[in-house]
Each structure stands twice: as C-alpha cells, then as structure tokens.
C-alpha cells in the first residue's frame, strides 16, 4: 500500500496558490493528515484487483490536473471575496477544501461506478472488449448525420 494525497503536494509548489496557502496554512488543510488528506491505495496490480481500488504507482497527471483545476476555482472565488469580506472568504475556502477532500476520497473508494484510473498501469479495464459499444456509438453517429430530418 502507498500513501495517496487527495490534495497533491504539487499544489504547494504552485506560486499562484501561494497567498491562499500562506493564509490557510499547510496544517489546516491537513496535507499530511491521514484523516483528511491521505488515503492508502494498492501499489501492485494484484492488490488493486483484489481490493477493487485504484492502483497507486507512478505519476497520476490527469488526477493532479483535475484537482489543480478545482483548487483554482476555490482560489479564484477566495481572491474575489477576500477584498470585501476576508473572514467569510477564508471560512468559505476552508469549507470548500474539506468538501473537495471528502468528495475525492469517496470517489476513489467507490466500487459501484467506473473506477478512477490514477495511471496507465492500473489493471482495471485491461482486456475489455469495446466492440459492441463502438458499434452502438457508430450507429448513433450515423443516425445524427447532417441532413437527416427528425421523424
């Protein structure tokens, strides 16, 4: 098992988030706190399949990019609101970070929906045949070709 940071440590290296993180503080966001920001995920393909959890090995760029985008939204709203109501802006940012962390944890642990793939080595989905799905998509695409009238 390996530690996975729900809010990636990469966030702390982004200067654009510096003012917000300087105000909030690394400890308040719980960057290294298992209860709020860390999740243990399998480090081997066999464990990932057995536990039905995402494989945590190597970089997970798409996940980090998605989280960076969400944090950018939080930071943008905080930047606008802090000029008029700094305390409200801080409280709102802290609440949104907590909600984001809970949502990320819940999504990574979910087994009913399509599993999150943190990296390309995740065995989930290996060997799946999408021929039938591709055929259905092709039929839908052909049915929506320009010039066809709705009936």
Task: Describe these PLM feature segments.
Residues 1-34:
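Histidine-centered nuclease catalytic patch
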Residues 3, 20-21, 29, 39, ...:
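Generic preference for hydrophobic/aromatic residues in regular secondary structure cores
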Residues 6, 43-45, 74-78:
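Conserved beta-strand->loop/alpha-helix structural units within folded catalytic cores of enzymes
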Residues 11, 43-47, 109:
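Hydrophobic/aromatic-lined pockets within catalytic cores
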Residues 33-44, 49-50:
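Elongated alpha-helical scaffolds
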Residues 49-151:
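C-terminal, well-folded lobe of enzymatic/effector domains
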């Amino acid at each position: 098992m390996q530690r996975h940071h729900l809010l990636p440590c990469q966030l702390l290296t982004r200067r654009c988030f510096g003012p917000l993180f300087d105000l909030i503080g690394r400890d308040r966001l719980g960057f290294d706190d298992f209860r709020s920001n860390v999740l243990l995920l399998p480090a081997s393909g066999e464990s990932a399949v057995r536990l039905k959890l995402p494989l945590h090995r190597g970089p997970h760029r798409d996940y980090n990019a998605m989280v960076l985008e969400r944090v950018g939204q939080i930071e943008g709203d905080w930047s606008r609101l802090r000029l008029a109501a700094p305390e409200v802006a801080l409280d709102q940012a802290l609440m949104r970070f907590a909600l984001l962390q809970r949502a990320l944890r819940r999504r990574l642990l979910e087994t009913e929906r399509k599993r999150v793939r943190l990296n390309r080595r995740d065995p989930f989905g290996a060997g799946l045949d999408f021929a039938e799905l591709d055929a259905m998509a092709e039929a839908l695409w052909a049915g929506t070709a320009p010039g066809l009238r709705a009936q």
